[in-house]
Amino acid sequence: MGKPRGLRTARKHVNHRRDQRWADKDYKKAHLGTRWKANPFGGASHAKGIVLEKVGVEAKQPNSAIRKCVRVQLIKNGKKITAFVPRDGSLNYIEENDEVLVAGFGRKGHAVGDIPGVRFKVVKVANVSLLALYKEKKERPRS
């Protein structure tokens, strides 16, 4: 049975198109409201949090490495996430109970590369850019 044809089939076409849209992954994501329910950031691009602990995440096969990450509890809703710390030696600038700014990490909410389950990265530590600390342009504020 093909699609209905004829003069009075417009309503049928419109209704069928409306139903079929839900099969499109991007349409469903945009219209179900899961962006606010499932996303720890609640639809925002960045979020602040407190560092709970430093963790090493093992890279997926065929790579062999321990990727340096931190467990962060978000201030806005108390959710706990794992965030990647980019660049070599940057973990030394982060201590437990520091306030960090966390951003998304590529791929529309999916894990990136060989780091399983890590969807966020650290951008700032104690209100100072992690890149500036790494390049030694700025120092950590004395507490």
UniProtKB/Swiss-Prot annotation:
One biological process term in Gene Ontology: cytoplasmic translation
Modifications after synthesis and translation: Hydroxylation at Pro-62 affects translation termination efficiency.
GO molecular function terms noted in the UniProt entry: structural constituent of ribosome
Region of interest called Disordered, as start-end residue ranges on this chain: 1-23
Compartments (UniProt record): Cytoplasm, Cytosol; Cytoplasm; Rough endoplasmic reticulum
Modified residues (3-hydroxyproline): 62
GO CC term, one of those recorded: cytosol
Biased composition (Basic residues): 1-19
Major site of localization recorded for this protein: cytoplasm
Xref: InterPro entries: NA-bd_OB-fold, Ribosomal_uS12, Ribosomal_uS12_euk/arc
Gene3D superfamilies: Nucleic acid-binding proteins (2.40.50.140)
UniProt keyword annotations, A-Z: Cytoplasm, Endoplasmic reticulum, Hydroxylation, Ribonucleoprotein, Ribosomal protein
Family note: Belongs to the universal ribosomal protein uS12 family.
Alphabetized PANTHER family for the sequence: 30S RIBOSOMAL PROTEIN S12 FAMILY MEMBER
Quaternary structure and partners: Component of the 40S small ribosomal subunit.
Name of protein: Small ribosomal subunit protein uS12
Originating organism: Drosophila melanogaster (Fruit fly)
